[in-house]
Amino acid sequence: MPNPKMDALNENSTDPQIQEAISSEIEMCMKEPGAEQKACAGKAYGMAREKTGKELNYGQ
């Protein structure tokens, strides 16, 4: 299922927009059967990095 918040990200997106898109993507991913939080987070961060071109080291 497409995530409009993730789809809207680009190189001009702000940190709060990026964080919201990542959270939304993780939430959607976790609804899938057999989903694991670590895998969903990795997927979401990877998508956000690709869309924004930013390193995204939140929480480190």
What residue ranges belong to the model's regions?
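C-terminal alpha-helical interaction appendages
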Residues: 1-60
